């Protein structure tokens, strides 16, 4: 996505910002290294869709019925003024949080907003292929291990798998490479609940 290379990870700097906008973050402690900057900011805004969000910012825009934070953002914008690059980013956010429009959080409004973004001539097929479906060889290997070592419980209605740190070290992957494993487990016929646990430092 355009602008991705300009993103910076907070490095503990003491800089104070006039405004801090937290997006898709349900709780203050989920901001990680950015939390000190949030607490020092002159004004704070939170845009989110998690029902667990209690509203930790000075101004909060939270819609627990929305499919994603990007859907909430779309409702705040004049869609006619949204650029193609911005539309691409918003579409990707909605697509990922809805599991490419298959999760129960997907509503008719979600689809209407996605359609409006598509009308901006965004490369929606490429976005989904490159950011949702395509995986590296190592990511496929570690998914294979998780599926191979999974087990079914409760008469096959629940499937569980575990990934240990030593396994991730063996494959040379991090927790970010584990995306999609629990979704793949959930697709098993007869399964109603999928649980994927992984060890962290």
What feature does the model see in each segment?
Residues 13, 25-28, 50-52, 165-166, ...:
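Short glycine-rich anion-binding loops that position phosphate/pyrophosphate groups of nucleotides
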Residues 1-40:
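N-terminal small/polar loop signature for handling phosphorylated ligands or for N-terminal nucleophile
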Residues 47-113:
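Short alpha-helices
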Residues 8, 21, 43-47, 59-62, ...:
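Hydrophobic/aromatic beta-strand patches that form the interior of the parallel beta-sheet core
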Residues 1, 16-19, 99-201:
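Hydrophobic helix-and-loop "lid/oligomerization" segment in the mid-to-C-terminal part
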Residues 3-6, 36-44, 64, 79, ...:
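A glycine- and small-aliphatic-rich helix-loop capping segment at beta-alpha/alpha-beta transitions
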Residues 12-15, 36-39, 53-54, 82-84, ...:
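Solvent-exposed alpha-helices and their adjacent loops that cap or buttress functional pockets
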Residues 4, 17, 41-42, 56-59, ...:
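Short, well-ordered alpha-helix to beta-strand connector turns
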């Amino acid at each position: 996505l355009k602008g991705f290379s300009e993103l910076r990870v907070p490095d503990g700097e003491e800089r104070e910002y006039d405004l801090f906008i937290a997006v898709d973050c349900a709780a203050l402690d989920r901001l990680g290294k950015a939390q000190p900057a949030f607490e020092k900011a002159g004004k704070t805004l939170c845009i989110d869709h998690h029902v667990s969000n209690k509203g930790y910012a000075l101004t909060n825009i939270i819609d627990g019925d929305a499919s994603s934070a990007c859907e909430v953002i779309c409702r705040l914008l004049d869609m006619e003024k949204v650029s193609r690059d911005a539309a691409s980013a918003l579409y990707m956010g909605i697509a990922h949080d809805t599991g490419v429009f298959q999760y129960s959080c997907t509503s008719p409004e979600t689809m209407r907003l996605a359609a409006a973004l598509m009308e901006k001539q965004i490369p929606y097929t490429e976005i989904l292929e490159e950011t949702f479906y395509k995986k590296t060889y190592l990511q496929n290997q570690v998914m294979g291990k998780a599926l191979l070592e999974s087990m079914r419980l409760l008469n096959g209605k629940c499937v569980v798998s575990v990934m240990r740190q030593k396994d991730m070290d063996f494959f040379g992957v991090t927790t970010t490479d584990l995306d999609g494993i629990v979704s793949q487990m959930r697709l098993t016929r007869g399964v109603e609940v999928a649980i994927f646990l992984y060890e962290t430092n």
